[in-house]
């Protein structure tokens, strides 16, 4: 739809080591990962950039609102495509997925209990940025659907409990959805990647 609600900027991706068996590289978030050639399509994370509030604050500007998050030419293109019958979809970062990308699954799950102020700041940041980007765009363009990539569950259930959803994730989704639905958005799509029945 012409808006970037997730990471903007970031580190330059660099290859640290490239052998016949694997590639080790650093990505835009500053994570180091290892991909085994011929065996895997998803790299194995070797480290994560966020461990505490100080390390988060170094990356926070990549997630904060900036005017250049909105490409008005793309917004106008989306409007023209919508007139031809195409669905206009906006995406927002996952309320569990972004912390997991920054900290890894284990540290993310512990963060809800051990460093709740860190989790609150991450959530407030992605909420404010997503809201401001999509609020501006939806003044000029009807967004038909909002989609969120979460991957917060496996076949045996979710990686996050109902209390954490209620406290940290639901307010984020609710604020974005209430604003967009008041302007005509009708569809909310979340990729869970597994069984989310325990947190519905």
Describe the predicted segments one by one.
Residues 1-12:
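Segments that shape or occlude catalytic/ligand-binding pockets
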Residues 11, 26-27:
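Long, low-complexity intrinsically disordered regulatory regions enriched in P/S/T/G and acidic residues
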Residues 12-13, 22:
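Short, acidic/polar N-cap/turn motifs at the starts of alpha helices
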Residues 23-26, 35, 53-200:
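Active-site loop segments of alpha/beta catalytic cores
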Residues 27, 47-49:
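Cofactor-binding catalytic cores of oxidoreductases
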């Amino acid at each position: 739809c012409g808006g970037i609600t997730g990471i903007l900027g970031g580190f330059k991706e660099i290859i640290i080591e490239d052998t016949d068996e694997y590639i080790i590289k650093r990505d835009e978030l500053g994570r180091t990962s290892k991909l085994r050639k011929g065996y895997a399509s998803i790299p194995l994370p070797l480290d994560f950039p966020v461990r505490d509030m100080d390390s988060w604050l170094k990356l926070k500007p990549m997630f904060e609102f900036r005017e250049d998050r909105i490409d008005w030419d793309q917004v106008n293109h989306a409007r023209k495509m919508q007139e031809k019958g195409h669905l206009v979809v906006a995406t927002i970062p996952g309320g569990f997925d972004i912390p997991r990308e920054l900290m890894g699954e284990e540290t993310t799950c512990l963060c809800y209990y051990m460093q709740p102020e860190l989790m609150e700041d991450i959530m407030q940041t992605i909420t404010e940025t997503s809201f401001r980007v999509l609020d501006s765009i939806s003044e000029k363009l009807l967004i038909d659907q909002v989609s969120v990539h979460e991957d917060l569950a496996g076949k045996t259930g979710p990686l996050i409990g109902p209390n954490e959803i209620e406290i940290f994730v639901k307010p984020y989704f609710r604020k974005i959805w209430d604003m967009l639905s008041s302007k005509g958005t009708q569809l909310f799509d979340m990729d869970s990647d597994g069984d989310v029945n325990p947190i519905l």
